[in-house]
Swiss-Prot record:
Positions of transmembrane segments: none
GO MF, one example: argininosuccinate lyase activity
Signal peptide: none
Record keywords, A-Z: Amino-acid biosynthesis, Arginine biosynthesis, Cytoplasm, Lyase
InterPro entries: Arg_succ_lyase_C, Argininosuccinate_lyase, Fumarase/histidase_N, Fumarate_lyase_CS, Fumarate_lyase_fam, Fumarate_lyase_N, L-Aspartase-like
EC code(s) of this entry: 4.3.2.1
Localization of this protein: Cytoplasm
Pathway in which the depicted protein is active: Amino-acid biosynthesis; L-arginine biosynthesis; L-arginine from L-ornithine and carbamoyl phosphate: step 3/3
Reactions listed under catalytic activity: 2-(N(omega)-L-arginino)succinate = fumarate + L-arginine
Any Pfam family matching the protein: ASL_C2
Protein's recorded name: Argininosuccinate lyase
Length: 457
């Protein structure tokens, strides 16, 4: 049964109904719609629309409906109801008769759906928070197990300076911390209840909206009814949060795809997160990581689509806003899946320390150490930079590492170079010197791991 039939003398065309109906996706708001209806029934008692006995009867029926929904959410979709609000109301009327028709007094689907969606978003933020923390914990655990795994760090995908696999893991812990912080910021702004705003001008019943907001677990009620029913900033913010985090996850995936490649061979991935080829028997493809990387664009598309949907809408509610849900649901589902998959990838990863160290010793990653050595000997840095560049060219010509060049060859570029240069060029020395906060020295990495464990406990 439609909630708006009295004005019309003809039934809706089936093609329009198919376009218009939203139950196939907004059934996911069933629990929130029922919870909101229970709170609204209590509010109607305070303005003498319902008696206490009527409210108790409605609440009992709604709680029974909630249990039914929780047992089998998908069963809702088989109904021909227009949307989740229509479905809940009709089910209620089926159970309690005409009393069910009183529940919508003073309420519009406009403030109802805005409330439902905010309640759903709050729940999702809690679940996403847990998934982010679990991935951070997996990264910290992997870092702790690989503090001694020296590997090359890259700029421009060229070997730059030595780092450790632990330090690499901790970089993503920091990115995820910002992702989680953005979620909490979004929660603060969306934690205001639109219920009681009516269609656009507010409800005609003197309901205490602050009390109503409290019953629903909101921090407060919205201040303007027009804004209340047309606001979808929280949808944009969550899609933005998801998009930024998916960029981080995509970079994580790309790094590991490269590290797992035959060209780098720094890590082995578990069979649980890889697949084979239908033609080439030797293949072990990093499909889980490639899917994370690929799904990043899908989430970005949801954000762009919602921006374009909202940009030209006049106040207050417009049916265009029904487009807020499918993209949001899909994007947050995708984000959750990718967070969980990234943690699963780490669960079985094996770091190949000898190969990592071998690669770190190649590519003249200790060149900066030689420049710093010259600076310590009184050579201006820019001059030292040039000297080391020339020394690298000579080392390449000879096919040797910098530390393998004889002292006499090094002294051709600067007379201040002495025997004490060789310990400076050692791989471990390169790490040990980076002892400022956030650096790659063993002490700093160990300290960062301890701090992260404390934050995530």
């Amino acid at each position: 049964m439609a909630l708006w039939g009295g004005r019309f003398s003809q039934a809706a065309d089936q093609r329009f109904k198919q376009l218009n109906d939203s139950l196939r996706f907004d059934y996911r708001l069933a629990e929130q719609d029922i919870v909101g209806s229970v709170a609204w029934s209590k509010a109607l008692v305070t303005v003498n629309v319902l008696t206490a006995a009527e409210q108790q009867q409605l609440e009992q029926a709604l709680n029974g409906l909630l249990a039914e929904v929780q047992a089998d959410p998908q069963a809702i979709v088989s109904s021909d109801a227009e949307d989740i609000h229509s479905w809940v109301e009709q089910k209620l009327i089926d159970q309690v008769g005409d009393l069910g028709k009183k529940l919508h007094t003073g309420r519009s689907r406009n403030d109802q759906v805005a409330t439902d969606l905010k309640l759903w978003c709050k729940q999702q933020i809690g679940e996403l928070h847990q998934a982010i923390v679990q991935l951070q914990q997996a990264l910290v655990e992997t870092a702790e197990a690989n503090q001694d795994a020296v590997m090359p760090g890259y700029t421009h995908l060229q070997r730059a300076q030595p780092v450790t696999f632990a330090h690499w893991c901790l970089a993503y812990v920091e990115m995820l911390a910002r992702d989680e912080s953005r979620l909490q910021d979004t929660l603060k702004r969306l934690d205001v209840s639109p219920l009681g705003s009516g269609a656009l001008a507010g409800t005609a019943y003197p309901i205490d909206r602050e009390q109503l907001a409290g019953w629903l677990g909101f921090a407060s009620a919205t201040r303007n009814s027009l804004d209340s029913v047309s606001d979808r900033d929280h949808v944009l913010e969550l899609l933005s949060n998801a998009s930024i985090s998916m960029v981080h996850l995509s970079r994580f995936a790309e790094d590991l795809i490269f590290f797992n490649s035959g060209e780098a061979a720094f890590v082995d991935l578990s069979d649980r997160v890889t697949s084979g080829s239908s033609l080439m028997p030797q293949k072990k493809n990093p499909d889980a990581l490639e899917l994370i990387r690929g799904k990043c664009g899908r989430v970005q598309g949801a954000l762009t689509g919602m921006m374009m949907t909202l940009k030209g809408l006049p106040l207050a509610y417009n049916k265009d806003m029904q487009e807020d849900k499918e993209g949001l649901f899909d994007a947050l589902d995708t984000w959750m899946d990718c967070l969980q998959m990234a943690a699963l990838v780490l669960d079985g990863i094996q770091v190949k320390r000898p190969r990592c160290k071998e690669a770190a010793e190649q590519g003249y990653a200790n060149s900066t150490e030689l420049a710093d050595y010259l600076v310590a000997k009184g050579v201006p840095f820019r001059e030292a930079h040039h000297i080391v560049g020339e020394a690298v060219v000579e080392a390449i010509r000879q096919g040797k590492a910098l530390e393998a060049l004889p002292l006499t060859d090094l002294q051709k570029f600067s007379a201040v170079i002495g025997d004490d240069v060789y310990p400076i060029l050692a791989l471990q020395s390169c790490l040990d010197k980076r002892s400022a906060k956030g650096g790659v020295s063993p002490q700093q990495v160990a300290s960062a791991i301890a701090a992260a464990k404390q934050r995530l406990a």
